[in-house]
Regions:
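Sec-dependent signal peptide recognition
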Residues: 2-10
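C-terminal motif of bacterial Sec signal peptides marking the signal peptidase cleavage site
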Residues: 15-18
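Bacterial signal peptide processing site
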Residues: 20-22
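A surface/extracellular/periplasmic glyco- and lipid-processing/surface-interacting theme
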Residues: 26-75, 79, 84-331
Length: 331
């Protein structure tokens, strides 16, 4: 009887120890689960940790030379400005890129500098208006000018006038900039992106018209499969000379602003300091926004109707500084 009792006691001890281990194992598993940390999402459009200075490149957009454009696909942001005679020019922003060919590159206008200031960008151009050159000097702009630089070359497959044939590469301008200027920056990227997909609570926006003048009429059509906007100018596909691909954009911002003539040479002063209205368009929807800019060197801020700064989808952006005397159509 005593032997049987001892055996039963031993069995009970073994069972209790085994159960204890199982409970401890379960407890340890729970604790391990609690300490799991999700990796932060990273943006694809820019490297938020990079300190490299961006480059702001002036791009020719006159109709006869538009077919010679190349390298715009690599730009994170492109701005369109009204210029003299109803034509427009682009300022394309590149960060952490080594694009082999960009162009055609054209001359500076003083308002183009206001965009470069927002990014602390090195300003790349080929020539300039009197007002442009005056401000480059007066405001101590770090620039690379094709008029006195070896970072440019001529290419003319379409037999265009000489002023429409200048190209550069980011490899070349970076090398030149490294010998002249500071090439790192602490300036925060001025546009605000969301790491999660943004779907606007707005009106349908699958067919957009953004004219600048009788001469320059832009439009966008939404590609719902790829969730981007295909760009057209005067009803024609806006296509890269080298890749033959149509330019597409994830985000479109329209900022409506006034302008005035500065002199008899028809140079314009774009009223990009102050405030105004516009639209933000992405993923087939559009909302009304406001824009504001305190001074030429400050960032332009875009807000929704509730006064909250808008967040862009993680992708490239086209910003239209559309004249207030032109009508935007969104369908």
């Amino acid at each position: 009887m005593k032997k049987l009792s001892k055996v039963l006691l031993a069995l009970l001890i073994l069972i209790s120890v085994g159960c204890g281990k199982k409970k401890e194992e379960k407890k340890e598993t729970k604790e391990e689960t609690k300490t799991e940390v999700k990796e932060d999402k990273k943006l694809n459009i820019i490297n938020e940790e990079s300190k490299e200075r961006p480059y702001a490149v002036v791009i020719n957009n006159i109709e006869v030379a538009r077919k010679a454009q190349t390298g715009l696909k690599d730009a994170q942001v492109i701005y369109e400005f009204l210029a003299e005679g109803g034509i427009t020019r682009f300022v394309a922003i590149y960060k952490d890129k080594d694009t082999a060919q960009i162009g055609t590159v054209r001359s500076a206008r003083h308002n183009f500098l206001d965009v470069a200031f927002e990014y602390d960008a090195i300003f790349v151009h080929f020539g300039g208006s009197t007002y442009g050159y005056d401000d480059i000097k007066k405001l101590n702009v770090n620039d690379i000018d094709g008029m006195n630089s070896s970072s440019f070359w001529r290419e003319n497959p379409y037999k265009l006038a000489r002023e429409h044939t200048a190209y550069t590469s980011l490899v070349k301008v970076k090398k030149e900039a490294s010998k002249k200027y500071r090439t790192t920056t602490d300036t925060k990227w001025p546009l605000n992106y969301s790491k999660d997909e943004v779907d606007l609570d707005g009106i349908s926006a699958t067919d957009i018209s953004v004219p600048f003048s009788n001469y320059t009429k832009n439009s966008y059509k939404y590609d719902s499969e790829n969730k981007v906007y295909k760009r057209y100018v005067s009803g024609k596909e806006h296509v890269d000379m080298k890749t033959k691909e149509q330019y597409t954009f994830k985000n479109i911002i329209i900022a409506k602003m006034g302008w005035k003539m500065t002199d008899s040479n028809y140079y314009l002063d774009i009223q990009d300091v102050g405030s105004g209205s516009g639209y933000y368009i992405t993923n087939g929807k559009a909302i009304e926004i406001t824009w504001s800019k305190k001074d030429r060197k400050s960032r332009m801020i875009y807000k929704d109707k509730n006064g909250n700064e808008i967040k862009l989808n993680d992708g490239n952006t086209f910003i239209e500084f559309q004249p207030t005397d032109q009508k935007t159509t969104i369908k």
